[in-house]
């Protein structure tokens, strides 16, 4: 996953930028200077007003939308027995799940104690607008 906006920001270059930022948010990495990703390291900032939050949501949901379009286009052919269709469907489901994995890990409370709390929006069709639902659903 590559960011089409990569030229707009020095620390926004897709999935690898997400991985580096989240590594710095944990306690397993020391940051000795004040350059790229310093606010991720110092603040662990996930507020809605933070630029990185906007980037995560826009980019991951754009990939989810693309995966949903591929899934919608291939569902009719799924029973054809064509292995390449099955592989593309599997890859699209995996990519979509991986994006949701990132969003849930960043913005979700632990499942076991928060089943009734609102979760992230789940889109399984292209061009849908859904309301948030409790995590238990």
Model-identified regions with their sequence ranges:
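Non-catalytic effector/regulatory segments
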Residues: 2-8, 32-39
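Conserved, well-structured interaction surfaces
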Residues: 33-107, 133-136
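Acidic helix-start/capping segments at beta-turn-to-alpha-helix junctions
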Residues: 18-23, 87-88, 94-95, 123
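Active-site substrate-recognition loop segments, prototypically the cytochrome P450 B′-helix/B-C loop
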Residues: 17-36
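Short coil/linker segments at helix-helix boundaries
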Residues: 106-137
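Generic N-terminal helix/loop capping motif
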Residues: 4-8, 27, 70-77
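Acidic, glycine-rich segments characteristic of secretory precursors and extracytoplasmic regions
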Residues: 1-20
